[in-house]
């Protein structure tokens, strides 16, 4: 049975580097959810992001707490939470700021359509 898709939470820079590199090497579309424990809208959208991970198992979803991984947040110039950065072949192709569910779904579907 296939492993159920999930959001990969990274808490250290080493963990981020290893898991992110593995996802890049796989060629998957990557969605990074930049969040913070104190961010109300982040908590609201978290269950939705988990549902998207199940709906799009061919996409790598990451959750990055900006307080835990400040360097990663700075690298991607994250200034507000939640922010979603979508990468294709290692390059940023989309950025969504705010808990905008419809836009997030649309942008993922454009770059990683579900093939039945």
From Swiss-Prot:
The keyword Cytoplasm applies. It is found in: Cytoplasm. The record marks 33 as: Deprotonates C-terminal active site Cys. GO terms for cellular component: cytoplasm. PROSITE patterns: THIOREDOXIN_1, THIOREDOXIN_2. InterPro entries: Thioredoxin-like_sf, Thioredoxin_CS, Thioredoxin_domain, Thioredoxin_H-type-like. Disulfide bonds join 39-42. Residues 2-115 form the Thioredoxin domain. Keywords: Cytoplasm, Disulfide bond, Electron transport, Redox-active center, Transport. The active site is at residues 39, 42. The keyword NADP does not apply. Its main location: cytoplasm. It comes from the Eukaryota. The record marks 40-41 as: Contributes to redox potential value. Participates in various redox reactions through the reversible oxidation of the active center dithiol to a disulfide. The H form is known to activate a number of cytosolic enzymes. PANTHER family: THIOREDOXIN (PTHR10438), THIOREDOXIN H4-RELATED (PTHR10438:SF453). Belongs to the thioredoxin family. Plant H-type subfamily. This is Thioredoxin H-type.
């Amino acid at each position: 049975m296939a492993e159920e898709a999930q959001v990969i939470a990274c808490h250290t820079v080493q963990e981020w580097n290893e898991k992110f590199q593995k996802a890049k090497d796989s060629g998957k579309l990557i969605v990074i959810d930049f969040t913070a424990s104190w961010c109300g809208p982040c908590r609201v959208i978290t269950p939705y992001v988990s549902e998207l991970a199940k709906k799009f198992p061919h996409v790598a979803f990451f959750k990055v707490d900006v307080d835990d991984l400040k360097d990663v947040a700075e690298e991607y110039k994250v200034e507000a939470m939640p922010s979603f950065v979508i990468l294709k072949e290692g390059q940023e192709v989309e950025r969504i700021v705010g808990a905008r569910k419809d836009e997030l779904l649309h942008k993922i579907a454009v770059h990683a359509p579900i093939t039945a």
